[in-house]
Curated annotation (Swiss-Prot):
Species: Mesoplasma florum (strain ATCC 33453 / NBRC 100688 / NCTC 11704 / L1) (Acholeplasma florum)
Lipid biosynthesis among keywords: no
Start and end residues of each ABC transporter domain: 6-236
The protein's assembly and partners: The complex is composed of two ATP-binding proteins (PotA), two transmembrane proteins (PotB and PotC) and a solute-binding protein (PotD).
Full protein name: Spermidine/putrescine import ATP-binding protein PotA
Lineage: superkingdom: Bacteria
Length: 350
């Protein structure tokens, strides 16, 4: 398709009879930042390794710029990979690590010097050219790995959980750096991550995977606000799942005997084969009788930026709620939400 730099078509993979990928279909546009997100064992790293050329699929096609990628050897693919371990050379300094690929291609000395220094500036390592790799921090090593990959001018940069080894604050900073670099350079990034916040904060689109299948592809906003199935709703963030609600008609649902307005349509009439999702941060705590349901605070947990409450309402339903207000166990409250807080999806077929 037009502008697709990379296309995976019904890609499958198994190891000794154990199916790892169950027919992956994915189109990636030139210049996109795509993240494969999922729990351990979901197939995201295998997908990346197949694209990189480290693994062969059992079946399916991978097209790069409209041509079959699979017969092309790793060193001929216009990709570079950044690993979680960085894979830097400990006996080389920063400059020589970054220059390694250009030297193997016998790049002219003046061009090599110019390109390496350009990347050193790009990743903010000016003054570190002669520094020994073992004397660098984790974040600095990550910058060297990025510069070493980008100096080869790949058309696609593959990133295998590149920030996983960093501490929390440094990881957050490097997320911003990765996104900045990707925007400035304009090449396609394909990253693997198990970190939801990481994927949602820096990706143009997120590919949510589980048990070898793609569960949903969409923008971070779509993935979070419009999960396509129960698994995605539970995996991405936190959710209140109403499994016994009724879709009365377009823009109307029923929860515990009360009718609520929603934005959803095309689920039929009086349909029970649906789940209703309401995020904890979308529920407001009100005084008794001021909301939709009265309830009692059963549990409170301070999370730093907010309190997490468990409130029991009608029919013993327990609601998880995030609020900046402090409450005590046994406080009497009521709960309320806006129409757009309700999201309806079909129940998963067993």
């Amino acid at each position: 398709m037009e502008n697709n730099i990379l296309e995976l078509r019904n890609v499958t993979k198994d190891y000794d009879g154990k199916v790892v990928l169950k027919g992956i279909d994915l189109n990636i546009k030139e210049g996109e930042f795509i993240t494969l997100l999922g729990p351990s064992g979901c197939g995201k790293t295998t997908t990346l390794r197949i694209v990189a050329g480290f693994e062969k699929p059992n079946s399916g096609q991978i097209m790069f710029e409209g041509k079959d990628l699979l017969p092309i050897p790793i060193n001929k693919r216009q990709f570079n990979t950044i690993f979680q371990s960085y894979a830097l050379f400990p006996h080389l300094n920063v400059f020589d690590n970054i220059a390694f690929g250009l030297r193997t291609k016998k790049t002219k000395k003046d061009i090599l010097q110019r390109e390496v220094l350009k990347q050193i500036r790009q990743v903010g390592l000016e003054g570190f050219e002669d520094r020994n790799i073992n004397d660098l921090s984790g974040g600095q090593k990550q910058r060297v790995a990025i510069a070493r990959a980008l100096v080869m001018k790949p058309k696609v940069l593959l990133l295998d959980e590149p920030l996983a080894a960093l501490d929390v604050q440094l990881r957050q900073h490097m997320r911003e750096e990765l996104k900045r670099l990707q925007r400035e350079i304009g090449i396609t990034f394909l990253m693997v991550s198990h970190d939801q916040e990481e994927a949602l904060s820096i990706s143009d689109r997120v590919v949510v995977m589980n048990e070898g299948s793609i569960q949903q592809i969409g923008t971070p906003e779509d993935i979070y606000n419009e999960p396509e199935n129960l698994w995605v709703a539970k995996f991405i963030g936190q959710s209140n799942i109403i499994e016994d609600g009724i879709f009365i008609e377009d823009n109307k649902v029923q929860i515990d005997g009360k009718t609520f307005v929603c934005d959803d349509t095309n689920f039929g009439e009086n349909e029970k084969s649906i789940d209703i999702v309401i995020r904890p941060e979308d529920i407001e705590i009100k005084k008794t009788n001021a909301g939709f349901f009265n309830g009692t605070v059963m549990h409170t947990t301070f999370k730093g930026v907010h309190w997490e409450l468990l409130v029991e309402t009608t029919k013993k339903r327990i609601w998880k709620i995030h609020t900046t207000q402090a409450f005590k166990v046994d406080d009497k409250v009521s709960i309320k939400w806006n129409d757009e807080a309700i999201h309806v999806m079909w129940k998963e077929v067993e």
